[in-house]
Amino acid sequence: MGTFLLLMAEASAVGGELAEGGAEGGFGLNTNILDTNLINLAIIITVLFVFGRKVLGNTLKTRRENIETAIKNAEQRAADAAKQLKEAQQKLEQAQAEAERIKKSAQDNAQTAGQAIIAQAAVDIERLQEAGAADLNAELDRAIAQLRQRVVALALQKVESELQGGISEDAQKTLIDRSIAQLGGGV
């Protein structure tokens, strides 16, 4: 601080000498830096203080409001994002539960359908076995009937051949006696 005052004093002395020389000639240059600078600084500081305070205050106020608004917007967006995330997680959980339910239902349906198919196959096999047995019995009955017809036909054929060959006398006599006995007469 002492150095500053010393410089001011020397500048004043030099400036005073120059000013005196300028006053003699009519026009002079005030080289007293401290005098001129102090006045200029006082004017600038006053202007800055009076007008700059308002401008700077308004600028800072606007800047603060912008920052506060940006912070509020960011907080609101963060809250909205958190809410949307929570909703999305709930929807995901619901979708996973629904998928699990559908999967279990499909497995149950597949198992039920498989059991139904197996049961139907067993019924079909039983029906086919019964139909096969019925067909076999029908074929057996038809074969037996054909054999009977064949036996009867062969017996008739034999009888006819014997009848055409004639009956022996003893057989004719026995036949006649039997017929008379049946009619009620006796021989």
From Swiss-Prot:
This is ATP synthase subunit b. The gene is atpF. It is found in: Cellular thylakoid membrane. HAMAP family: ATP_synth_b_bprime. It is a single-pass membrane protein. The chain crosses the membrane at residues 32-52. F(1)F(0) ATP synthase produces ATP from ADP in the presence of a proton or sodium gradient. F-type ATPases consist of two structural domains, F(1) containing the extramembraneous catalytic core and F(0) containing the membrane proton channel, linked together by a central stalk and a peripheral stalk. During catalysis, ATP synthesis in the catalytic domain of F(1) is coupled via a rotary mechanism of the central stalk subunits to proton translocation. InterPro entries: ATP_synth_b/b'su_bac/chlpt (IPR002146). It comes from Nostoc sp. (strain PCC 7120 / SAG 25.82 / UTEX 2576). It holds the Pfam family ATP-synt_B. Belongs to the ATPase B chain family. F-type ATPases have 2 components, F(1) - the catalytic core - and F(0) - the membrane proton channel. F(1) has five subunits: alpha(3), beta(3), gamma(1), delta(1), epsilon(1). F(0) has four main subunits: a(1), b(1), b'(1) and c(10-14). The alpha and beta chains form an alternating ring which encloses part of the gamma chain. F(1) is attached to F(0) by a central stalk formed by the gamma and epsilon chains, while a peripheral stalk is formed by the delta, b and b' chains. One of its GO terms (cellular component) is plasma membrane-derived thylakoid membrane. It comes from the Bacteria. Keywords: ATP synthesis, CF(0), Hydrogen ion transport, Ion transport, Membrane, Thylakoid, Transmembrane, Transmembrane helix, Transport.
